[in-house]
Amino acid sequence: MRNIMYFGGTCQSPALPALVRPPAPPLQPSLDIKPFLPFPLDTAAAVNLFPNFNAMDPIQKAVINHTFGVPLPHRRKQIISCNICQLRFNSDSQAAAHYKGTKHAKKLKALEAMKNKQKSVTAKDSAKTTFTSITTNTINTSSDKTDGTAGTPAISTTTTVEIRKSSVMTTEITSKVEKSPTTATGNSSCPSTETEEEKAKRLLYCSLCKVAVNSASQLEAHNSGTKHKTMLEARNGSGTIKAFPRAGVKGKGPVNKGNTGLQNKTFHCEICDVHVNSETQLKQHISSRRHKDRAAGKPPKPKYSPYNKLQKTAHPLGVKLVFSKEPSKPLAPRILPNPLAAAAAAAAVAVSSPFSLRTAPAATLFQTSALPPALLRPAPGPIRTAHTPVLFAPY
C-alpha cells in the first residue's frame, strides 16, 4: 500500500522528465481569424451598396473607387483630326481654331482648284470621245453606202438618208471647230489691243511698281502718288531721274510679259546725285527719306562726326608758322664755354654747307635779344657742385 502511494506520489512529482507529462492542448491557428469588415470585390455588389452611384459627383466616385475598388467606366478618347492637313487635335477648341486659320483655307482652295482642273480635263476627254464616235459613225455609214449600191435599192435609200444626216452633223462639227480658233484668236487679240491702264484696272495690279490693290479706288490713289509718277518719269526719261542702258547687256532679247521697260538699265537721280544699278534699287531710293527731303526742297541735314572735314582744313587757333629760307646763325661764343665753341662752329658749318641733306631749322616764334654776359656769369659762392659741360647737338 505504501508502495502504491509512493509510486502515485512519484508520478505527480515534478522531478520526472517532461516526456512523461501529457501534451498541452494545441492552439488555434491565426489563419482561422475572420476579417473585421469583409467587403465584396464584385463591382456589381459594390454598386448595389450605393444606389445613386451613377448620379454621384466625380469626386465621390473616385473616393468610392479608392476605398471599395470599384473601377470607373473607361471613357474612350475622341480623336479629332483634319484629313486635309493631316493633323490631330486634343480638344474641340484647337480644331475650331485650325479650321478658321489661313493654312487650312489655303489647302482647301488648292484642293478645290485641283478638283476643278480634273473636271475640266474629264469634260475635254468626253468631248473628244464624242467627236471620235461621230467620225467613226460617218465612216461606217459611208462604207454601208458602198455596200448598198451593190445590194437592193431600199437599203440604198435608207443609207443615203443616214449619210445625209451624218454629213449634216459633220458640217456642224467642222463649223464649230472653225469658229473655236477664231474666237481664240479674237480673245488673244483683245489683250494685245488692251492698254496698260485697262489691264491694271482689270487685274487691280500695277505692273510698273509691282503693287497689288484690293479696289479701283486704291489703284487710283496709287496712280496719283509720287512713287508711281517718279517711276513713270524714269521710264519715259522726262523727269529728274534719267535711265541709261546697262553696259554689256544686249538690247534685243525675248520680251517678258511683265516687262516694265526698266530692266537692264542704270538710273541717275539728278536731285540727290545718286547712281543706282537696278529697278529695285531705284524704288528703294525713291522711298527713302533722303530723296523725299531733297524733292521737297529741304536742306540736307549735317552729318555729325568726330572727324569733320572742316576741322581738318581750318586750325582752331589760327597760328601760322613762319619758316625762313636763310640758314640760322651760329650761337654766340659767349654763351658756350671755350671747349664747346669749336664743336658749335663745326655744326654750323655743316648746316650751312650745300652738301648737307638736312633742312635749315625753323626760326623761333618769338624774336628776343640775346642775354647779356653779366647774367651768364657764375655765382660768387659755390652753391652747388660743378658738372661736366653737356653738348646739345642735332645728331
From Swiss-Prot:
Stretch list, region Disordered: 169-194, 282-309
Residues in the signal sequence: none
Keyword Metal-binding: yes
Taxonomic superkingdom: Eukaryota
Subcellular compartments: Nucleus
Gene: ZNF385D
Main location (coarse class): nucleus
Phenotypic consequence of H387Q: In a colorectal cancer sample; somatic mutation
SMART domains associated with the record: ZnF_C2H2, ZnF_U1
Zinc finger (Matrin-type): 80-110, 204-234, 267-297
This protein's GO CC annotations: nucleus
Effect caused by changing A386T: In a colorectal cancer sample; somatic mutation
Biased composition (Polar residues): 169-193
Chain coiled-coil ranges: none
GO molecular function: sequence-specific double-stranded DNA binding; zinc ion binding
Protein name: Zinc finger protein 385D
Keywords linked to the UniProt accession: Metal-binding, Nucleus, Repeat, Zinc, Zinc-finger
Matches recorded under InterPro entries: Matrin/U1-like-C_Znf_C2H2, Znf385, Znf_C2H2_sf, Znf_C2H2_type
